[in-house]
Amino acid sequence: MDLLNRFPNTVPFSEDIGFIAKVDDSEEGGNDYAFFVTVHEVAHQWWAHQVIGADVLGSTMLSESLSEYVSLKVIEQVNGKKKMRKFLKRALDEYLTSRTFERKRENALMYNDGQGYIHYQKGSLIFYALSDYIGEKTLNKALSKYVKKVAFQEPPYTTSIDLVNHIKEVTPDSLNYLIKDMFETITLYQNRIIETKSKKLDNGKYKVDIEFKVSKYRNNEKGRAFYGAEERDSITYQSDDMKKPEYSVFLKDYIDIGIFGKDEDDNEKEIELYLKKHKILSLIHI
């Protein structure tokens, strides 16, 4: 039987959770999950022991999602961002897979009904991404202010709405769409690269042309996709050779565009050549 819990000054482990773990400490290896879950449980000394959410929808965002966020940031400091990309990709895959087996309903993160794949996998992705968009110091400042306000609170207890309001206060107007996409709705992307071309320049650098598509859509609690028709905020694209148009929720999004290479001496080692956010306003970009 797996066991993992936390008490004041104590984090008990069962053997299945950590003691028989085989950790690959190499640069190409994965993250030390025993270390990760230990950090998660220690983080509960703040998120669940000091900040106690009311027994309503979204309460596990305050405990589990924020403990996951703390774990990610500690892992990032110890292992670097390269390994974080592996962890985040796995979390995304687990979220997308798990939601296909939902038998009840999937709510937005701040109204989640206690499903693990939402408050763990999706929650960790959202808070980590938010720290990347608005800045880690900015997000942590909002979290610190929130903790000071509600720590050891007597009933009525705090809710996810209160936390999201604190985050709104520090989010710039240009990124307000993130609050709706990340917390208030179920928002997904259908992004893909259509074509790439590269040319070596005389100075030894490369010019890279990328044609890509960015499309954003929402899901209701039963998994039905819609593209903003309920709010009349959708956009479309249709080329001459397309039988049907493609749709997207109205775009004003900052999307990461990256180019990665392999180390000449170590083909398994990934090298970041370019990574920058670009503001996207339409579906197709060349």
Model-inferred region functions:
Residues 176, 188-282:
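Beta-strand-rich binding/interaction modules
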Residues 284-286:
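Conserved small/polar residues in nucleotide/adenosyl-binding loops
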Residues 1-211, 219-221, 225:
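Hydrophobic alpha-helical and helix-loop surface patches within well-folded domains
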